[in-house]
UniProtKB/Swiss-Prot annotation:
Function description: Functions in the biosynthesis of branched-chain amino acids. Catalyzes the dehydration of (2R,3R)-2,3-dihydroxy-3-methylpentanoate (2,3-dihydroxy-3-methylvalerate) into 2-oxo-3-methylpentanoate (2-oxo-3-methylvalerate) and of (2R)-2,3-dihydroxy-3-methylbutanoate (2,3-dihydroxyisovalerate) into 2-oxo-3-methylbutanoate (2-oxoisovalerate), the penultimate precursor to L-isoleucine and L-valine, respectively.
Cofactor info, note text: Binds 1 [2Fe-2S] cluster per subunit. This cluster acts as a Lewis acid cofactor.
Keyword field contains Transit peptide: no
Record-listed Mg(2+) binding positions: 88, 130-131, 449
Alphabetically ordered keywords of this record: 2Fe-2S, Amino-acid biosynthesis, Branched-chain amino acid biosynthesis, Iron, Iron-sulfur, Lyase, Magnesium, Metal-binding
Entry annotated with the keyword GTP-binding: no
Substrates-to-products reaction catalysed: (2R)-2,3-dihydroxy-3-methylbutanoate = 3-methyl-2-oxobutanoate + H2O; (2R,3R)-2,3-dihydroxy-3-methylpentanoate = (S)-3-methyl-2-oxopentanoate + H2O
Cofactor(s), by name: [2Fe-2S] cluster; Mg(2+)
EC number: 4.2.1.9
Taxonomic placement: Bacteria, Pseudomonadati, Pseudomonadota, Gammaproteobacteria, Candidatus Pseudothioglobaceae
Gene Ontology molecular function: 2 iron, 2 sulfur cluster binding; dihydroxy-acid dehydratase activity; magnesium ion binding
Species whose genome carries this gene: Ruthia magnifica subsp. Calyptogena magnifica
Protein name: Dihydroxy-acid dehydratase
Pathway: Amino-acid biosynthesis; L-isoleucine biosynthesis; L-isoleucine from 2-oxobutanoate: step 3/4; Amino-acid biosynthesis; L-valine biosynthesis; L-valine from pyruvate: step 3/4
Binding site for [2Fe-2S] cluster: 56, 129, 198
Length: 559
């Protein structure tokens, strides 16, 4: 009879602290709070993204402390360490935004580095701002040690139901003389009342919801207020749950399967989530060695409706969804309709179906989540477009409010700042297709988000009159007729590089087409005469990212 091999929950820490030869390691750990008994416990690293850089993360040190309590009370030894965060909202529209996507890779690399070096047996990662979520998950799945992600939680609405996007759009209103300087200053002072991630179904809330649907967070972790007893309890429970994962040897790659990624895509479509989910889920799948492709979003999107009336395209904020029950009743609706894989394993140690078994439906009186047979849009708002402008794909977010097609004449800009200046100075008119190029992963480098120009378009009252296309990306707060992630990007010789002012462009979201309506012979001649610009950076982290980054359709990954 074969003897059953028991999993050692101290698989990694034992190599660091066990035996007489590891006395120097133990000596270093006594001053940071270890007792002799602690060396016999599984060590759990708590990766905190705390920072005073942004309100999204300013409270996460307290959440890390709560997580530590949960680990230590359940027989583990928790060690808190930090990784970085940047603020998309603060750097948006500036040269600094080029570092945003880079931060995803730095977060992943730093978590992998610390945990790999220190020999932690398990990990709990806590994130707030947009790139924290995919960065943490990429780091966790590379390590493939028992792990959980905790979302820092959503911010409360500002006064008069405002948020950060309200401020961006107010800039356009000010330029349009719709509001004055005093009104603009008032909006900037009231829009962001305290800690938590940006309040609509923007990138942070989108990715938190995706990670929960993926199975890497505890139930409803994605739908809790940043400052709340629920969020504190979520952290304590995550600390407890990671010990259960250690004892059962359940690791991220056991959870993050192709079917789990399909669940994540389904949920973010139903919620009306950010285009950034396409980029980040592909990157997360790549780290997990799951063969998720950009066209999988089209396949899944054909059968999943948009049912959440959430900002930016809708009316409500995440904190209002929290009040009616969060994301769990929505997931139960999708499961009961056969749109989710209920047999996927999650960090509870149970399947998704088991987690949702006793979830009650939303109250009939609520207006945020619609019934599946009465959707906002009958299929996905995330459209993967192809055509001569995007032979390898582009991503649009079309809810239907903008219409389903747009044909107009190009106005071309090689920097985001130039496009924004043109919008604010009334150089964009009805029927224009604003083309912002050389903003891709390599060309930017860093694939900046175009929230400043798209918000200016909205503030100017042009939201339903113009379109914007780019090889950069969009904030989750962007709405309007916009297409991003155009691949191949301009810097790599994509057709986007040779679009000229006045060229006619067709965006057809119904048939998933993005086409430059110029004869192929003319396009070929332009490409023959095109010369690649000099790189914007030749040293430093941006230059490094430009050398390593793959295309947007491949998640802009660097490994």
């Amino acid at each position: 009879m074969r003897r059953k091999i028991m999993y050692n929950p101290r698989k990694y820490s034992s190599q660091v602290v066990d035996g007489f030869e590891r006395a120097p390691s133990r000596a270093m750990l006594y001053p940071v709070g270890f007792t002799k008994e602690d060396f016999n416990k599984p060590q759990v690293g708590i990766a905190s993204t705390w920072s005073m850089v942004t309100p999204c993360n300013m409270h996460i040190n307290k959440l890390a402390d709560e997580t530590l309590k949960g680990v230590n009370a359940t027989g583990g030894k928790a060690i808190i360490f930090n990784t970085i965060t940047i603020s998309d909202g603060i750097s948006m529209g500036s040269e600094g935004m080029k570092y945003s996507l880079v931060s995803r890779e730095v977060i992943a690399d730093s978590i992998e580095t610390v945990v790999g070096c220190q020999g932690f047996d398990g990990v709990v990662a806590i994130g707030g701002c947009d790139k924290n979520m995919p960065g943490c998950i990429i780091g966790l799945v590379r390590l493939n040690r028992p792990s959980i992600f905790v979302y820092g939680g959503t911010i409360q609405p500002g006064k008069n139901h405002t948020d950060v996007v309200s401020v961006f759009e107010a800039v356009g209103q000010f330029a349009n003389h719709t509001i004055d300087a005093i009104e603009l200053e008032n909006i900037e002072k009231i829009a962001i009342p305290g800690p938590g991630s940006c309040g609509g179904m923007y990138t942070a809330n989108t990715m938190a919801s995706a990670i929960e649907a993926l199975g890497m967070s505890l139930p409803n972790s994605s739908a809790q207020d940043a400052i709340s007893d629920d969020k504190n309890n979520d952290c304590v429970q995550a600390g407890q749950a990671v010990l259960n994962l250690l004892n059962k040897d359940i690791k991220p790659r056991d959870i993050m399967t192709m079917k789990a990624f399909e669940n994540a895509i389904t949920v973010i479509i139903a919620l009306g989530g950010s285009t950034n989910a396409v980029l980040h889920l592909i990157a997360m799948a790549s780290a997990a060695e799951v063969n998720l492709k950009i066209d999988d979003f089209t396949r899944i999107g054909q059968k999943v409706p948009v049912i959440a009336d959430l900002k930016p395209s809708g009316k409500y904020m995440m904190s209002e969804l929290v009040k009616i029950g969060g994301t769990l009743p929505l997931m139960k609706m999708l499961l009961d309709a056969g749109l989710l894989h209920g047999d996927c394993l999650t960090v509870t140690g149970k399947t998704l179906a088991e987690n949702l078994e006793n979830v009650k439906p939303y109250a009939d009186s609520q207006e945020i989540i619609r019934a599946l047979d009465n959707p906002i849009k009958k299929d996905s708002h995330l459209r993967i477009l192809r055509g001569n402008l995007a032979t390898d794909g582009a991503v649009a977010k079309i809810t239907g409010k903008e219409g389903l097609s747009f044909k107009g004449n190009a106005k071309c800009f090689s920097r985001e700042e130039d496009a924004l200046e043109a919008i604010l100075n009334n150089q964009i008119i009805t029927g224009d297709v604003i083309v912002i190029r050389y903003e891709g992963p390599v060309g930017g480098p860093g694939m900046r988000e175009m929230l400043a120009p798209t918000s200016a378009v909205m503030g100017k009252g042009l939201g339903d009159k113009v379109a914007l296309i780019t090889d950069g990306r969009f904030s989750g707060g962007t709405h309007g007729f916009v297409v991003g992630h155009i691949t191949p990007e301009a810097f790599e010789g994509g057709v986007l590089a040779v679009v000229k002012d006045g060229d006619e462009i067709l965006i057809d979201a119904q048939n998933n087409v993005l086409e430059l309506l110029v004869e192929q012979a003319i396009i070929d001649k332009r490409l023959y005469n095109w010369t690649q610009p000099k790189p914007n950076y030749t040293k430093g982290v941006l230059a490094k990212f430009a050398k390593l980054a793959k295309s947007a359709s491949e998640g802009a990954v660097t490994d």
